[in-house]
C-alpha cells in the first residue's frame, strides 16, 4: 500500500513539474510578445534583461529541456537590437550557440522553433569576418523548420521573409499567404495574430514590388523597341 502511494506521489509530482514548466514557458512567451509588440522601444532593453534573467533561471532548473534554452536564445537575439554594436554581436553569437545546443537536445521542441530562429539569425547576421551570416545555412534551417511544422505561422512567415530579402518574390508570396491562413494557437492568440498582421503587410509589400518589377520590365522592353 505504501509503495503504491509512493509511486502515485512520484507520478503526480512529475506531472506538476511538467505543468509548471509549460506554464512558465507560456508566461515567458506572453511577456516577450507584450514587450516586442506593445512596449515603447526605449523601454524594451531593460524589460528584455529582466525576462532573460527569469528564462536563464528556468533553463538551469530544466537542463534537459530544449524549450527554456530556445527562449533564452530568442530573448538574447531580440534584445541585441537595443544594445551597442559589440554587445549585440556577442549576443547573437551566444543566441546561435544556445539554439545549436537546443537542437542537440530536442530538434522537435516548440515545433521546430530553434530552426526558425537560427535560420533567421543566419540571414540577418553580418557575414564573415564580422559575423556568421550565411544565406545557404539560413535557407537550410528554415526549410527544416517547415518540414517539422509546415502549417506554422512563424515557420512560413520567416521563410517568406528570407525569400523576400533575396528578391524571390513569387515564392515569398506563397509563404506569406500560408502564414496568414495558418491557425493561431488559442493560448497565444495575441502573439500569433500580431505575426499574421506582419505577414499581411509583408504580402502587400511583396505584391507591390512584383508590380514595380513588372512595370520596370515593360518600360525596358518599350524603350528597346523605340530604339529599334
PLM regions: where:
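Short coil turns that delineate tetratricopeptide repeat
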Residues: 63, 107-109, 150
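TPR/TPR-like (Sel1-like) alpha-helical repeat modules
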Residues: 96-100, 133-139, 169-187
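N-terminal leader/linker segments that initiate helical-solenoid repeat arrays
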Residues: 17-54, 58
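Helix-turn-helix repeat elements of alpha-solenoid scaffolds
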Residues: 41-56, 88-97, 131-136
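TPR alpha-solenoid repeat register
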Residues: 68, 112-114, 155, 189
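Terminal, low-structured helical/coil segments at or just beyond the last alpha-helical repeat
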Residues: 181-228
